[in-house]
Amino acid sequence: MRSHQMAAFFAVSLMMMVVLGALSAPIPSPRPIEDIYPSQLPDAGTAQIVAGDSGILPTLLAVGFDPNDRSVLKPVKNSMTQRNTA
């Protein structure tokens, strides 16, 4: 009976700690608009390039893509699957 009381006490204590921790957390304040510099905003010229011809990036990616390239695939050497032929 005593162990049930201790378990209930610890469960309630844990719940109280979680609730108090969540309630006492600081509220994040958003940065004011004055902290955003013009250099962080997108360039109007870039937007015109993207809107005018958005096919250049997929084209560049497709030029460098080779579906038969196996240079990064290396055979796995596993002593359990290799047979000793000597």
Curated annotation (Swiss-Prot):
The name this protein goes by in its record: Late effector protein 1
Coiled-coil region(s): none
Protein family: Belongs to the lep1 family.
UniProt entry tagged with the keyword Hydrolase: no
Annotated TM spans: none
Cellular location(s): Secreted; Secreted, Cell wall
Span of the signal peptide: 1-24
Record's subunit section: Interacts at the cell wall with secreted rep1 repellent peptides.
Biological role stated in the UniProt entry: Core effector contributing to spore formation and tumor formation at the host plant. Modulates surface hydrophobicity promoting cell-cell or cell-surface contacts. Lep1 and rep1 interact in aerial hyphae to form a strong hydrophobic layer. Plays a crucial role in hyphal aggregation that might be a prerequisite for strong proliferation of diploid cells and for induction of the morphological changes associated with spore formation.
Keywords per UniProt: Cell wall, Secreted, Signal, Virulence
Recorded phenotype for the gene knockout or disruption: Leads to attenuated hyphal aggregation, fails to undergo massive late proliferation and produces only a few spores in plant tumors, resulting in reduced virulence.
